[in-house]
Regions:
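Structured catalytic/nucleic-acid-binding cores of DNA maintenance enzymes
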Residues: 1-121
Length: 123
């Protein structure tokens, strides 16, 4: 399980790479990872922009235009920024297509990670 320094490093790295990027589409390949209704999750994230990056304990909180995307890496979760031409593997469970032509890919070999959309009033 990533410790707090690793979680903070993930957060700062993502902030540097995707702040200001808009989500064009979301591909959920393992629906059990999503705490919300999957279709609602995908629709609500579409056209949202990554604005702020926060951490509460080991939870990553991505402030979007009108909601918060909360993510917990659990045991082995990792985020990658990749070109869409790079092949995915069976451990890539959520893929965010971004407006710069790149993809933010969430990979978790053990499938323990979780994502949830929160309203802004939760923070």
């Amino acid at each position: 399980m990533p410790e707090l320094p690793e979680v903070e490093t993930v957060l700062r790295t993502l902030e540097h790479q995707i702040q200001g990027r808009r989500i064009l589409d979301v591909d959920v390949r393992y629906p059990k990872m999503i705490e919300n209704d999957v279709e609602q999750f995908k629709q609500q994230l579409k056209n949202q922009t990554f604005n702020t990056f926060m951490r509460r304990g080991k939870y990553l909180l991505f402030g979007l235009d009108d909601c918060i995307l909360m993510s917990h890496l659990r045991m082995e979760g990792r985020y990658y920024i990749q070109d869409p031409t790079e092949p995915t593997n069976r451990h890539m469970h959520v893929i965010f297509r971004l407006d710069n032509g790149k993809e933010l890919r969430y990979m978790d070999t053990r499938k323990f990670g979780r994502m949830e959309i929160l309203s802004l009033i939760h923070i």
